[in-house]
Amino acid sequence: MFARILGLDVGTKTVGVSVSDLLGMTAQPVETIKIDSEAGELGFDRLAVLIKEYKPEKVVLGLPKHMNGDEGIRAEASRDYGTKLANKFGLEVAYQDERLTTAQAEKVLIDGGVRRKDRKKSIDKLAAVLILQNYLDAHALKL
């Protein structure tokens, strides 16, 4: 593979960002970008810097589905964000089911002894790591 993939956990106020290693085996946290989706501030200026730095071949966005698998308004917003991202940067965009990733991320932080105040700073980028790692695991090269 030898190319990185960015993972994004897109919310209404923040975008958690993660990146894969060059082999596409592991995901690492990068940062959390503050956005204001209602005002149309999608964090693309900061993403442009990260895309230039990491040179990903693809971006994976979390797709928030209902527990029964249906897609609702948040999934529609995620797909809209992905379309805008693809149009702006010319990158392939893929989607990964993100059900329970925020809950998983919170559990990891709690189990790690991270204080509530500090969890808020890390939860979105950790959710982005889980989204990207789930994608990498599902699309791993079979050796």
UniProtKB/Swiss-Prot annotation:
InterPro entries: RNaseH-like_sf, YqgF, YqgF/RNaseH-like_dom, YqgF/RNaseH-like_dom_sf
GO biological process, one term: rRNA 5'-end processing
Group of enzyme by EC: hydrolase
GO function term, MF aspect, one: nuclease activity
Keyword Transferase on entry: no
Cellular compartments annotated: Cytoplasm
Keywords, alphabetical: Cytoplasm, Hydrolase, Nuclease, Ribosome biogenesis
Entry EC number(s): 3.1.-.-
GO cellular component: cytosol
PANTHER family assigned: POLYNUCLEOTIDYL TRANSFERASE, RIBONUCLEASE H-LIKE SUPERFAMILY PROTEIN
Family annotation (NCBIfam families): RNAse_H_YqgF (TIGR00250)
Its job: Could be a nuclease involved in processing of the 5'-end of pre-16S rRNA.
Family membership: Belongs to the YqgF nuclease family.
Name of the protein described by the UniProt record: Putative pre-16S rRNA nuclease
Organism, scientific name: Lactococcus lactis subsp. cremoris (strain MG1363)
Upper taxonomic lineage: Bacteria, Bacillati, Bacillota, Bacilli, Lactobacillales
